């Protein structure tokens, strides 16, 4: 959970409201933890995403790109891998999961921002790689661009056989 998505250039009150919950979920999670970071560069506004969302955010090396302090501390405590990603879905996520778990994971749980962009992209990517692995999204530890788009994303993930918990 990066600063720009919480109270920075693309922040929302809903994002602010889940910071402590995400830290709690990370703290109590018994397994490997991976944090993904949206990562953009100076040419962002000239990219496909930048043309459709012309708001600079998560620019590499900025405070907005960094994980929120509470999340960074928890990532350190849990010895999390922090992955930069340049697309909504982290294309190397399955590879990293298998490195950390020594093979196909027993289950996967996702939390964070934004439910309707990155979380859903990663959930569907992981479901494609691991069709028999239970994939959970903790709705109480996610927030979307809007409350309605959060709900829509949860509904879409259910249709794709992703298990939504704590809704």
Per-range role (PLM):
Residues 82-121, 143-167:
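Conserved N-terminal glycine/acidic-rich loop preference
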Residues 131-138:
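Short hydrophobic/aromatic-enriched beta-strand-loop microsegments
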Residues 75, 97, 101, 130:
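Active-site catalytic pocket residues across diverse enzymes, especially alpha/beta-hydrolases
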Residues 7-8, 46, 92, 120, ...:
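Short, function-defining helix-loop hinge/capping sites that tune catalysis or transport
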Residues 21-28, 120-130:
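Histidine-anchored nucleotide/phosphate-binding helix
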Residues 1-82, 103, 136, 145, ...:
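Active-site acidic carboxylates
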Residues 37, 112, 139:
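Short beta-strand/turn micro-motifs composed of small residues
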């Amino acid at each position: 959970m990066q600063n720009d998505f919480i109270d920075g250039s693309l922040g929302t009150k809903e994002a602010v409201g889940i910071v402590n919950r995400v830290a709690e979920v990370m703290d109590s999670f018994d397994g490997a933890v991976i944090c993904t970071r949206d990562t953009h560069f100076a040419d962002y506004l000239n990219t496909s995403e930048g043309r459709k969302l012309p708001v600079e955010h998560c620019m590499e090396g900025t405070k907005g790109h960094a994980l929120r302090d509470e999340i960074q501390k928890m990532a350190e405590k849990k010895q999390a891998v922090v992955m930069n990603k340049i697309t909504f879905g982290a294309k190397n996520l399955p590879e990293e999961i298998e490195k950390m778990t020594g093979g196909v994971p027993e289950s996967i749980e996702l939390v964070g921002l934004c439910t309707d962009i990155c979380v859903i992209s990663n959930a569907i990517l992981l479901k494609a790689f691991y069709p028999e692995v239970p994939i959970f999204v903790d709705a109480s530890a996610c927030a979307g661009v809007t409350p309605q788009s959060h709900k829509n994303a949860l509904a879409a993930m259910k249709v794709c056989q992703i298990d939504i918990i704590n809704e």
